[in-house]
Amino acid sequence: MSRFTSATHGLNLSIKMPISVSQVPSIRSNTSKYELQKLRSTGRSVLQTRRQLAIINMTKRSEADDNDGVERRKGVFHPNLWDDGFIQSLSTVYHEQASYRERAERLIGEVKAVFDSISMGDGDQFISPSAYDTAWVARVPAIDGSSRPQFPQAIDWILLNQQQDGSWGSQSHLSLTHRLTDTLACVIALASWKIESVQIDEGLDFITRGVEKLQSESVPAEFEIIFAELLNQAKSLQLSLPYEHSCLQSLWRKQEPILANGLMDSVAKRSLSSLEEMQDHRMNTDSDGTMHVESFLSSPAVAARVLMRTGNPICLAYLNNVLNKFGDYVPGMYPVDLFQRLWMVDNVERLGIDRHFKKEIQVTLDYVYSYWNGKGIGCGRDSLSPDLNSTSLGFRTLRLHGYNVSADVLEHFKDRDGKFVCSSNPTVGEIRSVLNLYRASLLAFPGEKVMEEAETFARRYLEEIVQKIPPSKFSREIEYVLEFGWQSTVPRWEARSYIDFHGLDTYSPWTIYEMASEKFLELAKLEFNIFNSLQHTELQYLSRWWNDSGMSQMRFTRHRNVEYYTMASCIAMEPSQSAFRIGFTKLCGIATCIDDIYDTYGTIDELKLFREAVKRWDPSAIESLPEYMKSVYMVLYELVNEMAQDTERTQGRDTLDYARNAWEAIIDAHLVEAEWIASGHIPTFEEYLENSKVTSGLHIAILPILTLDVPLPDQLPLQEIDTLSRFHHLASTIGRLSGDMNAYKIDLAHGEESSCISCYMKDNPGTTEGDAHNYANVTISYLMKELNLELMGQHNRVSFLRTSKKPAFDIYRASNYMYKYRDGYTIADKETKNLVMRTLVQAVSL
């Protein structure tokens, strides 16, 4: 057992010595008798006393080194933001109180039951009623020509489901526009059949009050179209509403240009959820007037409108089928068995609770894939036409899980000119479809031109649309996806963000999964907070370890253990992955110290001595080192040995030589960069990248992956996961290019002239810093596609590689986040601080 207790042995903080007394640095004469007596009086053993004295001597030497006459460069960074007192004070109740865990376990069981019901074909019970669609169905007259409703049960549902405030619709929807639309549709349905009911008056009163409030709200174009047309119908029925109100007059004025712009004309195969509100001449028809019934066989409201106009028997059969399923109401969409499954998987993954449902996710995606075809999918297996939303979400989810899906499926959503197009006044359905198209496009493989076209189109569309729609959870979700995409986010950060804007689209005219959505969100919040308690415990241990090791006394280096632990816990969110989180944090902490020694603090002679000590791998090697390096060397030595023991317990294989080789490689590469700095040499771009792939540290950061409970096959050489593998080559190169672009000016300020920017400009005389940035961005874009292929392609031979690449990719993504705006390791008091606060310090409100 090493002196710092193994991460896989809980958080026992006892300190033991792995080396003999003769190997402990001797007590220097500059240790006072008072200090010696004070240490001995605490009852420590001789070995513990000697170690503490070594730390005291190291501290004194570190202070003396500042005035030792050696010219030393200093890094440009701010002090540690999180002192030990603050860390030790962190506390929550969620891990301690069993009631939270018990509630979470019940919710896990309930969500599993939802998955199971859906897989058995009984998922309709989780689809919520749509007051809006039910109102349209209630208006359909009997097909036999009698003066009665064809679907009287829909009238009964309206009469039985008015809210106390006079409105109709889901009470969970806070959007006023949503409630107004539902209520007016239901009032019109009742009035159409001349039903004498106080409920009509109560509904009209709610609308009148709502119109007054509407003046202070920003409303979407979708509402303007739908509500204005409903107002026309209400006026024809002589319903008492404030038609002269300025707000309603404004809606009417806006309606005509919106319709004149051809809302439905230019969009290929898009959602038709608002078609029922268009004027008759805007119905989806061919030039000869033939109507496309298949376009609206997933929308009860559209089917009802067409049935009223045409008596189409397919629409009648469709509505009969839906009401047979749900009784006296209809949902906003049906059938949705494919989209429902994709929605389930997408939500549990984005909320960070997917680890509980791995089996269910596999079964669910196998079902979706069985209906996948070259043109994509619709909402349901019986959909006659694919839609962009279901296809985009399906493509993204299936590719992420390793299914063989071709990007060519997106070609079917272009217009005749081969372009993705949109309407001038889009609906929520269209925006959601384009958002999922953008998310899918970020998983492009090399050579997939349609994915590049989709990304360009969707990004431009979303950037414009987010400026137009009202602030809402949906708009914040769009902003998040645009800002972080796929390569610059990590699971816990995404979960924390998605908890904030998870829910029903705030102004969509229908909802389908209200009950399941509430369960998902409650479970996600509980899981987030329970894990938050474990984070505090682990971080408190790590803070004590850092202090006990003497590393906290090093003034020349960045102290970023809280930030590194935050990254680790954003990547590995399972409680059982403690060894990974702790090992990752320790390794990154010592790697940063060594990086700062080689980048700024050490002399070339000292750096060579440290390299030789690492190659010897013997505690006695510290005698040749400067005082400030001794403690660093011993922490490195013991940590690497400790983690090799952890890995051997997990994998049953000795990985010490592999870990030592990884450290020797990074220190050799650090020395090369130090010599470049000392001599003022600027290498070629290729030479720089080749060396910096190693100094990026990815092959060090991934070592804790070996502690995960993923068996390493006996026949798999360790070199398969080494820095020479293609996956790590790509990730390291992208990481270095991304980091250099944001750290270039800071590095230049403290003497590091070698970076991808300066090397490119040297190789290409006459080019500017902007040219170098453009070249780096183009290179990153290409390499990201290669990296996607490595992660999600069909060629991975060994299950360990497929499984281990995901956390390795998440480490790369975490690094991308840290360098997204600036060097987030050096300047950690801005975006990095926000990451720490939101994913580690603060719990979420239940």
From Swiss-Prot:
Keyword match Plastid: yes
In UniProt terms, what is the effect of altering A743T? Strongly reduces catalytic activity
Q: Where is this motif: DDXXD motif?
A: 595-599
Impact of altering H670 to A/W/Y?
Slightly reduces catalytic activity
Q: Which Pfam families match?
A: Terpene_synth, Terpene_synth_C
Q: Which cofactor does it need?
A: Mg(2+)
Which residues does Mg(2+) 3 bind? D747
Asked if Oxidoreductase is a keyword of the record, the answer is no
Cell compartment(s), UniProt: Plastid, Chloroplast
One Gene Ontology molecular-function label: magnesium ion binding
What is this protein's tissue specificity according to the annotation? Expressed in young and mature roots. Expressed at low levels in barks.
* InterPro entries reported in the protein's UniProt record: Isoprenoid_synthase_dom_sf, Terpene_cyclase-like_1_C, Terpene_cyclase_plant_C1, Terpene_synth_N, Terpene_synth_N_sf, Terpene_synthase-like, Terpene_synthase_metal-bd, Terpenoid_cyclase/PrenylTrfase
GO term, biological process aspect, one: diterpenoid biosynthetic process
- Which residues of this UniProt protein bind Mg(2+) 2? D595, D599
Q: Which UniProt keywords apply?
A: Chloroplast, Lyase, Magnesium, Metal-binding, Plastid, Transit peptide
User: Which reactions appear under catalytic activity for this entry?
Assistant: (2E,6E,10E)-geranylgeranyl diphosphate = pseudolaratriene + diphosphate
Its EC number(s)? 4.2.3.180
Interval spanned by the transit peptide: 1-58
Q: What does the sequence similarity comment in the record state about its family?
A: Belongs to the terpene synthase family.
Q: What is this protein called?
A: Pseudolaratriene synthase, chloroplastic
Species of provenance? Pseudolarix amabilis (Golden larch)
